[in-house]
Amino acid sequence: MILRNSPVKLGDMKTFFKRLVLGLLTLIVAASLLIAIEYFGAQPMGLFSGSRPTDLGFKNGAFAKPSWKPNAVSSTIDKADETHYIAPIHFSGDAASSWSKLTAAVKAQTGARVIAEQADYLYAEFKSAGMGFVDDVEFALDAKADVIHMRSASRLGVRDLGVNRRRVEILRSQIAAK
């Protein structure tokens, strides 16, 4: 209640409460950010990196099947799955040379970090600029069939706006050009 002879005016009280509410909201947002950083801070790549999948690898001639989400592509699934299927990289000639070209092309990509590199398997994480979303990308050399199988999948979200498909198509074109 404001007294008639009070030196505090109604306009001053409104300003005071606006500033109080703004200050409290700022504290709440700051506390939420600190909690999020504490919770997600153990992950090496940031808040939007997600967790590394546990089903990585090329087993029995195939990668793990993509989820229902349209943010992944794989060359080892049924061709009828138009959302997820992508053709493997076909090569002619020396398998080791084609594999070497692929490995070099992956390492040269912005945001790429090779996690596992073997004679016939490559696993890399691709971190997007800005928000730091991470995609898991795998390649497997099938020298007998003259192909390199691939799988590229987003860890988070539902749609990737074609990022995973474009990535492997760019790598395909870079290998063909060399």
Give the residues covered by each predicted segment.
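N-terminal Lys/Arg-rich, disordered targeting/topogenic segments
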Residues: 1-19
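Ser/Thr-rich, low-complexity intrinsically disordered terminal regions
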Residues: 14-23, 33-178
